[in-house]
């Protein structure tokens, strides 16, 4: 909690108005003590009681964004094997990012929605989904609950639509962190991040960018005239640009 209030003070001192916090890491551990039963049942719950600190931060008119890892959840994939994303041979898929979970898995879907609803109730204004994608390796994947053979894009879009639909009544803003390659239409078939669909589903599209590529990325995503890139495209940058919406990662 003290770290949260210190971070909020730093944001205000820097002239910012929002704080982006990783609340569910790819490893699976939560950054707060959750009341969602599945978190305790599988030993992934955090210990921090954040309610008072969040009230303090909100009192400073700071906009709070929670980053929630979706398709990478190492601990859950290990501890509840049925949730793991499978290779064609039936083994759990893992890589340098961690253990991946099946985007069609009902447990994973309802767990994510429950966590996001709780974050909203705690005072978060927005959730940004990280790892809303599939692995970039060309390994053949198997979605255990699906009788057909959906593509990676099918899988990512299906999860995105589920999350959007089931959180719409909360008033929580829902965004996605996508890769620069997906915006530039590179590796999109592997990642499953269909940029003709995701910007239409989410309130904002976030991307880790650099000073060298941020304008190219913004132009690419702004090619869809229905997408207001000035307010809905949010680059994560090491250094603040002169204007526009952005998040600094320092």
Feature map (PLM): residue ranges:
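Substrate-binding cleft/loops of secretory-pathway carbohydrate-active enzymes
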Residues: 175-211, 247
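Active-site-adjacent "subsite" loops/lids of carbohydrate-active enzymes
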Residues: 1, 71-117
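Aromatic- and acidic-residue-enriched segments that line the glycan-binding/catalytic groove
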Residues: 32-41, 73-95, 137-147
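Aromatic- and glycine-enriched glycan-recognition loops and surfaces
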Residues: 2-13, 39-63, 154-158
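The substrate-binding groove and active-site-proximal loops of carbohydrate-active enzymes
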Residues: 1, 34-46, 96-110, 147-151
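Aromatic-lined carbohydrate-recognition surfaces of secreted/lumenal glycan-active proteins
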Residues: 63-72, 128-129, 150-192, 227-240
